[in-house]
């Protein structure tokens, strides 16, 4: 299983104070020196709430690890990434809503202009991945547009797992719709969410598409996904950075790597 480390929220700390620390390149090399991280993931959002254009340029120039850039189909961002001298190893196209706290679901593959943006990246020799819900129609769209990799949105699975097996339902930001469900209901929905991820990962494999996954994954809920043999990559960020605040980034990375690289 490949481990993609999302370092957006290291930059969030910097941007909260509009200062120079923490330094994104220091985080990059801490990750690299663990020898456990396979790629670095960043999300270049339209509102630039964390990652900035300058961060993209620095990482692509210096990084010894592959860089996966998440972004919307915004024309300005597409033009910027297509114009780069140093290319990312892949671009993952994600949905984006400026009012969201974090990405809320998979891409709507009927989105106007999506096919054109995919072609623009392909024409520049940049691999494209699509951040999608684990649905067959989305996989067929990927295949029709010569997309060789997808990332399944694991938010539904992760939230259900957290509600059932952690203290999430007793916290200030508990998800109200899950808080009102019984343990039996949560277990059934979690089982179905896992089965759907497993089915669609297998479907992707038979379609010649590499299946990755990410969103809301943490040190508790990630373990079950290791039972899906056709899942090749996990992208994880917030939980690692959250633990890093308490134990340090190197230790946080190593603890996660120990779980997913058995």
From Swiss-Prot:
It is found in: Cytoplasm. PANTHER family: PYRIDOXINE 5'-PHOSPHATE SYNTHASE. The keyword Transferase applies. Keywords: Cytoplasm, Pyridoxine biosynthesis, Transferase. Pathway: Cofactor biosynthesis; pyridoxine 5'-phosphate biosynthesis; pyridoxine 5'-phosphate from D-erythrose 4-phosphate: step 5/5. InterPro entries: Aldolase_TIM, PyrdxlP_synth_PdxJ, Pyridoxine-5'_phos_synth. It catalyses: 3-amino-2-oxopropyl phosphate + 1-deoxy-D-xylulose 5-phosphate = pyridoxine 5'-phosphate + phosphate + 2 H2O + H(+). HAMAP family: PdxJ. GO terms for biological process: pyridoxine biosynthetic process. Belongs to the PNP synthase family. This is Pyridoxine 5'-phosphate synthase. Catalyzes the complicated ring closure reaction between the two acyclic compounds 1-deoxy-D-xylulose-5-phosphate (DXP) and 3-amino-2-oxopropyl phosphate (1-amino-acetone-3-phosphate or AAP) to form pyridoxine 5'-phosphate (PNP) and inorganic phosphate. Gene3D superfamilies: Aldolase class I.
